[in-house]
C-alpha cells in the first residue's frame, strides 16, 4: 500500500514541448533565447555575486521556460536582504533550518549571522552545490546536499519497505517532537510549484516524511497566484483545488512581504489563464509573496491522526469533480443522513465548491461522528482508492517527479 501512496498523492504530469516552438527554425529559436538570456544577465549586473559566478553557471538557468521549474534560486542581493529582514524576527536559532535551493548562498550567508544550531541546504544544481560547499567549509553548522527536497517523500516510502534510514541521513540532527511542541524544523525556500504545497499536505495527511519529526515552520516565497489561491475563501473561486482546501485546514499562515519576481532564476512563463483572477483582487502580479505557514497546534485534537487520511480522501473526492453535490455524496456512504446536514444549512443543491475550508471540515467532523460511519463503505472505498494502481514504474515516476525537471524547453 505504501508504494501506492506515492502514485495517488503526488501527481506526476508529463512535460511536453509545444509543437509550435518545436517547428520554428533552429536559428530563430537560438536568437530569441540568447536575447532573453542577455535580458536576464543585464537584470542582475548590479549584483557582485552574480557577476563573479555568471561565467560558470548552468546556462539553462538564464533562459525563460515554458513550464514551471521545481527549483528556483534567488539572485538578488537586495531581495535576499528583504527576505532575511522579514523572517529573522520569526526564526529560532535553536531550531534547525532547512534551506531549499540556496543557489549562490545569498540568503544562507545572512542566516549564518544568526548563529543557528544547524542549517541543512538542499541544492540540485552541481555548480551551486560547489558554491555552497565552499561556504560550508568555513561554517561547521552548514551541511549541503545535492538533491531535491521532494525526494524525502520517496525515501520515506523506501525506508518503510526495506527498513532503511535514507530520511534520517538527509535530516541529521533533527530531533523528533510531539505535535503540540514547538516546530521541529524551520524550512525556507522559493517555489512556483503547487506540488510543494501538495507535498506538505500529503505529509500531514499520511503522517510521513518530514512531518514524522513534528510540526515544521515554513517560510516560502511563491508567485501571487499560489498565495491568493490558498487565501481564497471558497472552493468555487479560481484554481482552488483539494490541496489548497486541505492546506487551509492544516495550516495557519500569513503574508510577510513582497519581492520582485525577476529576482529569481530561472524566469518562467506564467499562463494568463492562471493569473487572470488576480485582476479582481487588486494585487501586484509582478511581486512574489513571502508567506509564513505553520501546521495548527490543535489540529490533531480536531482531527485524530487515524482520520487524517480519511479527510484527505473526503476532500479529494468532493472537490475534484466539477459539480459534486454534498448531500447525495454523503448519503452514498450513510443513507438517510441528509436531513441532519439540511438542518445545518445545506440544501440538496449545495456542492463542495460552494464551501469554505472551515465549512467542509465541519461537515467531515459531523460525518465521521455519525453512528453508521464505522460500518459504512467509506473506509473500504479509501483502501480501494489507495490500492487502485499497480506497483510498476514507481521508481521511474519518482525520478520524473524530482530530477526529471532537468532542462525544460526555454521560451521567448
Which positions does each model-derived feature cover?
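Catalytic cores of RNA-modifying enzymes
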Residues: 2-312, 375, 389-411
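Short, flexible/disordered secondary-structure transition segments
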Residues: 118-119, 337-341, 374-378
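Phosphate/oxyanion-binding loops and surfaces in catalytic or ligand/nucleic-acid-binding neighborhoods
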Residues: 233, 237, 333, 370
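An accessory alpha-helical subdomain
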Residues: 286-297, 302-359, 364-368
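Short, charged/polar low-complexity linear motifs in solvent-exposed/disordered segments
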Residues: 247, 345, 379-381
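Short, amphipathic C-terminal "tail helix"
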Residues: 352-410
